[in-house]
Curated annotation (Swiss-Prot):
This is Putative peptidase PfaP. Belongs to the peptidase S49 family. It is an enzyme of class 3 (hydrolase). One of its GO terms (biological process) is proteolysis. Keywords: Hydrolase, Protease, Serine protease, Signal.
């Protein structure tokens, strides 16, 4: 929101801009999304526990810590009722701040954003109908809008993040793992996992 006081910000969403991605985008002057973009997810994220999987492989995890709650979000053990209560309080505060920031960025009421939140995901078209994004379009349309807002007739330079070696390797492996794609593994693991975490943390 501070950047909007000194410059124009236009967001172009591609395949996915959900949860933290939408949190960041919500402060822009204008948001463009593709019809099939996955966005929204103002709310919850499931948290995986790996202790059973590691146990089946004969792997045991030992934790050394200083502080009673230092490993409260450990992936390798179940949380205690006391930890659940503490974490839920923190997450509720984070969730409320998330909703309030989106409402402020999108110039909507908190109640209207709450009605769209609770972790729901939306396609680009659904997000447009619910005023979570401003226009259906891609990078070309977003750049045209940025030029208009800035009253700039020249060519806008593009700076794209270079893929890391890990990203390239992951893409190569993904193309050869049709039946074991990352998406299938991701959703299979999440299917029976408890909802423990609301993301993202507040962005300052």
């Amino acid at each position: 929101m501070r950047l909007r006081k000194t410059r124009k910000i236009v967001v172009s969403m591609k395949d996915m801009a959900a949860s933290g991605g939408y949190y960041i985008a919500s402060s822009a002057d204008k948001i463009f999304a593709l019809s099939g973009t996955i966005t929204g997810s103002i709310g919850v994220l499931q948290w995986l526990r790996y202790q059973r999987a590691f146990g089946s492989l004969g792997v045991k995890m030992r934790t050394y810590k200083e502080g009673k709650y230092k490993d409260s979000l450990s992936l390798f053990r179940d949380s205690t009722p006391e930890e659940d209560e503490m974490i839920q309080k923190m997450l509720s505060d984070t969730y409320n701040e998330f909703v309030q920031d989106v409402a402020k960025g999108r110039n909507q009421t908190v109640k209207s954003v709450q009605n769209l939140a609770e972790g729901r995901i939306y396609s680009g078209q659904d997000a447009f109908r619910n005023k979570l994004v401003d226009e259906i379009g891609g990078r070309k349309e977003a750049l045209e809008e940025l030029s208009r807002l800035c009253q700039y007739d020249g060519e806008i330079p593009l700076y794209e993040e270079e893929e890391s070696p890990f990203d390239r390797l992951f893409m190569m492996l993904g193309s050869k793992m049709n039946s074991f794609s990352s998406e299938r593994i991701f959703f299979r693991e999440f299917k029976n996992s408890p909802v423990l975490v609301i993301l993202p943390q507040a962005i300052r």
